[in-house]
């Protein structure tokens, strides 16, 4: 989300996208081409290969203080150099979402329960050349929504899952002027709780980063950093892919399943006659890496908006039904001309007045461009002891535009960092969030 965005996502385990480290927090969360401390285990495991010695880094922060007063986020990272055999590391994340109130079906309070999320990752990184490296994370995550299901729900409101991160880093390109990197994080199977049929994809994210060494003097260093990222999750709303005016109605082999002329809700009849799934779904990761760049504008057809009746259109802009012969108006039954999908006069709207027929034409490539999240940061070091930082986090779809500020201190083997997110409280839940990090090299 980095930490703030991706609110538009239909992915699960979004807590994995919360950005750790006060240093990153002060630089607009731009970090994957920097990755030169223990937090590289999170940002880009490829960065660990360039580190010498060992380092331990941690952060504790009160999370989303504008929304809740009992949420906390903790992060701990470690790296260890194996000299000619590369580097190892890892990190632990714990997000405590606080106490929730349990009620019965009639709204009576039954007590409280805890909600929390945690993950642990192991990292390995090795040099490809003197100036390039690759890295890998293997992680396990546990999400605990509640201690038991509610009402008639079957199953458990918690899940245990796994995932992987892959990173590449190139140092000192263009005569030492530029570092650049790419990572693909949170690659893994879908996540489910109560109902496996409603499983959400992992928050798989592709990032590209650049670190420009604008000033490299003995006592003065200035770096300008830029990251751009995209959630590579291809999720589709209920849509009419084949243009027959219906969402689904057939099984995977093309056998029809209509009841009174309307697609059945029975499981297995989510397809059109060509075998394409038309109900809400998402692509598997091996497809989503590619289709996530076009799913919001090029792929799919007219959407079944909001009421999800499986019918595309059928009502005119005044709310008049155009497909039933006998209708009741002011208590009287009247006969009207029946119009089928595609006929002149067939209503383009649904019962709620939302345009459905032809709404696929309203999507454009800008829908995809607007899903990109941009992070810009600047960091000035004096004598490798004191740093001043600034940055900007921009997420168009999530309606987030947040300036960030921070500073860092290094003394002997100890480090302290502070990061501050400045934003309007009504637009960014991270407004006025202050992050503090400590590190120790040994």
Residue ranges and their predicted role:
Residues 4-442:
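Subset of outer-membrane beta-barrel
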């Amino acid at each position: 989300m980095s930490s703030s965005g991706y609110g538009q996502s239909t992915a699960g385990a979004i807590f994995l996208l919360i950005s750790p480290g006060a240093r990153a927090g002060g630089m607009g969360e731009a970090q994957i081409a920097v990755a030169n401390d223990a937090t590289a285990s999170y940002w880009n495991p490829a960065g660990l290969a360039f580190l010498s010695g060992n380092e331990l880094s941690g952060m504790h922060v009160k999370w989303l203080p504008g929304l809740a007063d009992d949420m906390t986020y903790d992060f701990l990272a470690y790296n260890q150099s194996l000299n000619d055999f590369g580097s190892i590391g890892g990190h632990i994340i714990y997000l405590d979402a606080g106490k929730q109130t349990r009620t019965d079906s009639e709204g009576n309070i039954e007590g409280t329960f805890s909600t929390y999320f945690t993950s642990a990752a192991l990292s390995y990184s090795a040099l490809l050349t003197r100036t390039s490296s690759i890295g890998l994370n293997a992680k396990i995550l546990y999400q605990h929504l509640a201690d038991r299901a509610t009402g008639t729900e079957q199953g458990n409101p918690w899940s245990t899952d796994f995932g992987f991160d892959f990173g590449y880093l190139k140092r000192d390109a263009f005569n030492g002027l530029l570092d650049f990197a790419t990572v693909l994080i949170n690659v893994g199977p879908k996540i489910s709780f109560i109902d496996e049929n409603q499983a959400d994809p992992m928050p798989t994210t592709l990032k590209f980063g650049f670190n420009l060494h604008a000033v490299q003097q003995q006592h003065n260093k200035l770096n300008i950093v830029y990251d751009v990222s995209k959630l590579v999750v291809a999720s589709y709303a209920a849509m009419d892919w084949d243009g027959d005016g219906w969402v689904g109605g057939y099984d995977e082999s093309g056998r029809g399943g209509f009841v009174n002329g309307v697609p059945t809700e029975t499981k297995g009849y989510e397809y059109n006659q060509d075998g394409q799934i038309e109900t809400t779904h998402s692509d598997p990761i091996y497809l989503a890496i590619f289709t996530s760049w076009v799913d919001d504008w090029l792929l799919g057809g007219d959407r079944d908006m909001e009421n999800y009746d499986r019918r595309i259109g059928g009502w005119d802009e005044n709310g008049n039904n155009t497909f039933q012969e006998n209708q009741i108006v002011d208590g009287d039954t009247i006969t009207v001309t029946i119009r089928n999908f595609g006929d002149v006069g067939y209503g383009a709207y649904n019962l709620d007045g939302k345009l459905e027929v032809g709404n696929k034409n309203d999507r454009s490539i800008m829908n995809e461009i607007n899903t990109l999240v941009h992070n810009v940061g600047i960091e000035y070091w004096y004598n490798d002891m004191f740093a001043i930082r600034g940055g900007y986090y921009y997420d168009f779809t999530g309606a987030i535009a947040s300036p960030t500020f921070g500073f860092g201190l290094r003394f002997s083997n100890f480090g302290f960092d502070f990061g501050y997110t400045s934003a309007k409280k009504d637009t960014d839940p991270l407004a006025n969030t202050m992050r503090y990090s400590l590190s120790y090299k040994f």
